[in-house]
Amino acid sequence: MAAMTVQLDMVSAENHIFSGRVAQLQVSGTEGELGIMPGHAALLTSIKPGMARIVKQNGSEEVFYLSGGILEVQPSSISVLADVVLRADEIDEQAAAEAKLRAETAMAGAGADFNYAAAAVELAQAIAQLRVVETIKKNIAR
């Protein structure tokens, strides 16, 4: 019996990132973590900065960083429209760690006119990138 799959199309503003049959998609929605499998109810939600994990038709996995965007689930397809998508191997771990430190330092010493929202977004994106890198390292160590 063939494994149940659903068509996934993942695009960013710059590129078409992934198109194919998947058994599962895990992504960070604004209301929490989502696990999407074939037969999932229709859904439209925002995506927050975080990791997206794809389990392909053959059982292999691929991990991405999404900076945010929109997730649409239909009976026969899933669409991810992301602002920025990076494959795990495209993430610069040192740059992400520096961005995290910059945002934390700026927030700690901020005055009344400081833009906390922008700093919080930068911090969330850096933390999400570092989590993707850490997940990949853990999977390699297994």
From Swiss-Prot:
Record flagged with keyword Cell membrane: yes
Localization of this protein: Cell inner membrane
Superkingdom, natural source: Bacteria
Coiled coil: none
Record's keyword terms, sorted: ATP synthesis, Cell inner membrane, Cell membrane, CF(1), Hydrogen ion transport, Ion transport, Membrane, Transport
GO molecular function terms noted in the UniProt entry: ATP binding; proton-transporting ATP synthase activity, rotational mechanism
UniProt main location, coarse: membrane
Pfam families to which the protein is assigned, alphabetical: ATP-synt_DE, ATP-synt_DE_N
Membrane topology: Peripheral membrane protein
Assembly notes: F-type ATPases have 2 components, CF(1) - the catalytic core - and CF(0) - the membrane proton channel. CF(1) has five subunits: alpha(3), beta(3), gamma(1), delta(1), epsilon(1). CF(0) has three main subunits: a, b and c.
Protein's UniProt name: ATP synthase epsilon chain
Species assigned in the record: Shewanella pealeana (strain ATCC 700345 / ANG-SQ1)
